[in-house]
């Protein structure tokens, strides 16, 4: 799924379906340039079931509410997540389904394969992809990530 400006087709942020009415996304996607400059729910639409933005075949959902983590810090991206509440539920299908959440936090999936998807830039020129991109990666430990990011990973 992708977040778009109403009337447009090019996603500028992604997210994950967690229920038929809720999307998990990055909090920085729900603000303009500062913590004081939160976007209005009506300024965001959610494209669901989209694979190729050039074909205009997607379900479009409006956002009724944006709930960001209360400790989100726009300057350093701490707690960078928001929940979008949709005005109408998503009809689940082979193209649109909620993410699978772990049954237990005891398993961190270190060493397992995870698939990452998005419409991000595909080259140095900064052009976004028109088709949903995906790559398989190996999940690293929290400790390794925290070391790599100089202790900036929050629990």
Residue ranges: model-predicted function:
Residues 2-6, 23-26, 30-74, 135-136, ...:
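Conserved H-D interstitial segment of serine endopeptidase catalytic domains
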Residues 7-9, 54-55, 73-76, 107-108, ...:
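Short glycine/serine/proline-enriched coil/turn segments at secondary-structure junctions
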Residues 19-22, 26-27, 87, 113:
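Conserved SET/PR-domain catalytic core that frames the SAM/AdoMet-binding pocket
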Residues 41, 77-79, 94:
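Short, solvent-exposed loop/turn segments at the edges of secondary structure
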Residues 50, 61, 81, 86-87, ...:
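Chymotrypsin/trypsin-fold serine protease catalytic domain
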């Amino acid at each position: 799924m992708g977040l778009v400006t109403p009337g447009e087709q090019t996603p500028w942020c992604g997210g994950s379906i967690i229920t038929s009415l809720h999307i998990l996304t990055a909090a920085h996607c729900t603000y303009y340039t500062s913590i004081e400059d939160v976007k209005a729910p009506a300024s965001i639409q959610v494209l669901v079931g989209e694979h190729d933005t050039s074909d205009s075949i997607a379900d479009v959902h409006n956002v009724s509410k944006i709930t960001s983590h209360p400790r989100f810090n726009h300057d350093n991206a701490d707690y960078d997540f928001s929940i979008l509440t949709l005005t109408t539920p998503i009809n689940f299908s082979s193209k649109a389904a909620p993410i699978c959440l772990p049954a237990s936090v005891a398993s961190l999936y270190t060493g397992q394969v995870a698939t990452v998807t998005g419409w991000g830039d595909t080259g140095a020129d900064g052009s976004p992809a028109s088709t949903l991109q995906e790559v398989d990666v190996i999940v690293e430990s929290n400790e390794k990530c925290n070391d790599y990011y100089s202790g900036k990973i929050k629990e």
